[in-house]
From Swiss-Prot:
It holds the Pfam family Ribosomal_S21e. Required for the processing of the 20S rRNA-precursor to mature 18S rRNA in a late step of the maturation of 40S ribosomal subunits. Has a physiological role leading to 18S rRNA stability. Keywords: Cytoplasm, Ribonucleoprotein, Ribosomal protein, rRNA processing. Belongs to the eukaryotic ribosomal protein eS21 family. It comes from Candida albicans (Yeast). It is found in: Cytoplasm. GO terms for cellular component: cytoplasm; ribonucleoprotein complex; ribosome. Component of the small ribosomal subunit. Mature ribosomes consist of a small (40S) and a large (60S) subunit. The 40S subunit contains about 33 different proteins and 1 molecule of RNA (18S). The 60S subunit contains about 49 different proteins and 3 molecules of RNA (25S, 5.8S and 5S). This is Small ribosomal subunit protein eS21. GO terms for biological process: rRNA processing; translation. One of its GO terms (molecular function) is structural constituent of ribosome.
Amino acid sequence: MENDKGQLVELYVPRKCSATNRIIKAKDHASVQISIAKVDEDGRAIAGENITYALSGYVRGRGEADDSLNRLAQQDGLLKNVWSYSR
């Protein structure tokens, strides 16, 4: 919802699970949001540049969070030499 100035005024903005594209509900207390910083050649974090993944409690409860995070990071080019059964 927006006010007359066009500013967002809602208290809750729903997120989607990065692995399943399901909406993460407000009462899903098992969900996590993980931010991975991009780094320069010296290994220092670049300010303001990061990649964020949201994982729902459903994915974490099934024990698929680590595989999902590896798959998402491979798609974004963060991991290159991780074993995958699909290769």
